[in-house]
Amino acid sequence: YVNRNREKILEADLIVLQNEIPEVAIAYTIRMCSDAGRTILWNPAPARALDRDLVERVSYITPNEHEVCLIWETDESRVGSLMEQYPGKLLVTQGEKGVSVYIPGRGLQTLPAMKVEVKDTTGAGDTLNGAFCAGLARGMDELEALRFANAAAGLSVQKYGAQAGMPTLEQVEAALAGA
């Protein structure tokens, strides 16, 4: 599939991958796209051991707080120093605690989750990843895109269902304006 669609894939400015496709397809796509200078976001869910060369090749990797410990075989107390090793690349989602990233010159940044009534967390991570990419595509810097994505994820958990919970651009902008 990847070979058949190589040209179309490489036309994209940003490629999003997740671990629900075969490992060989992920590895091939990451190498192909990084060699072509494309921006790559990798959501490593479901969590499994990752090839460190592939981690180095992606632009962003977005595990949740449990997945990061499984992938890097570490405990929660070391996640902050792990984020320092991957500045601006390792974005760790933490449910009701929000999302964290280490930004050079600014240190560890944790954006708190919106205080909302949670109905269903299904799809919150997917919403965050998609909104982060949408923010980047709209010209936002990483931290601004992450704020945008965090707001989108906060809105998404207020409804039942992954797709039904995904907010519109207008809803995210309104939530940010009211924040």
Enumerate the language-model features and the residues they cover.
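Ribokinase/PfkB-type carbohydrate-kinase core domain
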Residues: 1-110, 171, 177
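Conserved phosphate-binding/catalytic region of the ribokinase-like
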Residues: 49-53, 76-179
